[in-house]
């Protein structure tokens, strides 16, 4: 998308339709498709940009999540899954090989040529044999389907072995883990009762994975609790010390154990934003010192603001990515529209259950009532409170979250914490863009191009034109 700032007087003339056709501002707004006249060529350009922005819909589901087990050897205070103890019955809480194979067969019937297979839990490495079966069976079927397939395992790394690392290397499997910050904060958030995934273990195994797989194959995210508010700089310093190139500053989700602990570790959207702003300011400061490092939420939103390209983050997609961009295959064979849909089911509400790999075909899974509900409630451009919002091109609908918090998949934006959080963040990103000097612009573009800051000496206007 184009970037163009107006003064208050200029904006008033623009929305009041009082700009003269000969004014330079009129010409510039037209050239950037903020207004159109009877020149159909500009409408064609705008249509092309819009189609590109929504191109994540072309291939349908590209992210396939396999929940290998509900068993876990950690005790995170904010766990959004109804986890089970590591000693729990494997026959009940682990995905079987038969379930895995049926899930893979459903996945491979989809039209997408580029797919990501993501392994989750619980702690997915507690069921490593089935992880291996999913990878090998997927690769065997792909001889016929010719898809581009990537794999990632989301793990606390506590049970990582050399055998696993060898398999990951052999099959190009990336690792995503969790680091909440320095030792005391990480262990406070994630290891109060069970110490298996304590800081020292995670750090040691991050370094093992980086050495075995390569730095670019290991990523991490952090989850924000009230305790995190004290350590915005220390959290980022920890990521840099671990040679992790970016951080995803994640807020709490309204599912699982996180609901029960909300009073002790939770916060308002406004409180989260104040923390997030301190983190982002520090990240930009570090980049100014020549330390290349990105914050994932800002990078995704800048991509939506500054380029015509889509993003793969389900929460910020419209039409919703729930069911249309992601599918979850649960340990028991049930299929869900998203990870959040699966978590909602663990809390006793199966509204967004799509079907079962044992009972349903590809067609009945994706054309059932749950998908119809998601289609009806998942287009932000058509929802009350979104349709007239200036930020709707950069936001998402997320009907599952709104149903979880409001018991209404359409959602009331006035009462929506999702809406409040992203409105605050997007407003701040526009403030950064408005005040950006050349160095800040280079930093932002380095995030979008995933390259070192010092490689970029970019004129933002020219770069936007190139991308469009």
Annotate the PLM regions.
Residues 1-28:
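Short amphipathic alpha-helical interface segments
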Residues 3-4, 24-65, 83:
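N-terminal [4Fe-4S]-dependent radical SAM core
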Residues 58-60, 65-95:
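Canonical Radical SAM [4Fe-4S] cluster-binding loop centered on the CxxxCxxC motif
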Residues 68-75, 123-126, 386-388, 392-393:
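Cysteine-centered iron-sulfur cluster-binding motifs in ferredoxin-type domains/subunits
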Residues 80-85, 215, 390-394:
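Detector for the c-type heme attachment site
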Residues 100-118, 127-254, 258, 264, ...:
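Radical SAM/AdoMet-radical enzyme domain recognition
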Residues 189-200, 207, 211-323, 328, ...:
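Radical SAM enzyme [4Fe-4S]-AdoMet core and its adjacent flexible, acidic
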Residues 345-468:
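Flexible mid-to-C-terminal extensions adjoining Fe-S/redox cofactors in radical SAM and related proteins
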């Amino acid at each position: 998308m184009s970037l163009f700032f107006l003064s208050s007087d200029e904006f008033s003339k623009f929305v009041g339709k009082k700009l003269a056709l000969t004014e330079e501002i009129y010409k510039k707004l037209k050239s950037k498709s903020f207004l159109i006249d009877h020149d159909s060529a500009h409408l064609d350009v705008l249509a092309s940009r819009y189609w590109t922005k929504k191109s994540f819909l072309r291939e349908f589901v590209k992210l396939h999540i396999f929940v290998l087990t509900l068993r876990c050897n950690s005790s995170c205070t904010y766990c959004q899954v109804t986890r089970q103890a590591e000693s729990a019955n494997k026959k009940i809480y682990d995905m079987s090989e038969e379930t895995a194979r049926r899930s893979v067969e459903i996945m491979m019937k989809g039209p997408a040529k580029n797919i990501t297979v993501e392994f989750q839990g619980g702690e997915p490495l507690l069921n490593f044999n089935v992880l291996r079966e999913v990878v090998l069976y997927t690769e065997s079927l792909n001889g016929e389907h010719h898809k581009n397939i990537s794999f990632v395992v989301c793990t606390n790394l506590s049970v990582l072995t050399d055998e696993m690392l060898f398999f990951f290397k052999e099959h190009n499997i990336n690792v995503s883990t969790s680091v909440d910050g320095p030792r005391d904060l990480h262990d406070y958030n994630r290891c109060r009762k069970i110490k298996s995934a304590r800081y020292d273990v995670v750090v040691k195994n991050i370094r093992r994975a980086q050495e075995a797989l390569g730095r670019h194959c290991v990523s991490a995210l952090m989850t924000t609790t009230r305790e995190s508010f004290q350590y915005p700089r220390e959290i980022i310093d920890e990521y840099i010390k671990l040679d992790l190139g970016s951080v995803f500053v994640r807020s709490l989700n309204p599912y699982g154990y996180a609901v029960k602990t909300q009073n002790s570790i939770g916060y308002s959207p406004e409180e989260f934003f104040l923390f997030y702003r301190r983190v982002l300011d520090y990240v930009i400061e570090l980049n100014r010192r020549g330390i290349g490092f990105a914050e994932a939420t800002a990078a995704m939103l800048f991509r939506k603001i500054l380029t015509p390209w889509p993003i793969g983050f389900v929460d910020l997609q419209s039409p919703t990515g729930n069911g249309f961009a992601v599918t979850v295959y649960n340990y028991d064979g049930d299929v869900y529209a998203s990870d959040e849909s699966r978590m909602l089911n663990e809390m006793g509400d199966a509204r967004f259950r799509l079907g079962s790999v044992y009972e349903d075909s590809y067609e009945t899974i994706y054309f059932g009532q749950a998908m119809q509900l998601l289609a009806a409630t998942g287009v932000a451009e058509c929802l009350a409170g979104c349709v007239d919002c200036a930020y709707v091109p950069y936001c998402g609908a997320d009907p599952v979250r709104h149903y979880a918090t409001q018991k209404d998949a359409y959602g009331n934006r006035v009462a929506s914490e999702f809406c409040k959080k992203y409105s605050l963040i997007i407003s701040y990103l526009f403030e950064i863009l408005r005040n950006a000097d050349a160095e800040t612009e280079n930093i932002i573009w380095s995030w979008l191009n995933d390259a070192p800051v010092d490689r970029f000496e970019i004129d933002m206007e020219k770069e936007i034109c190139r991308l469009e």
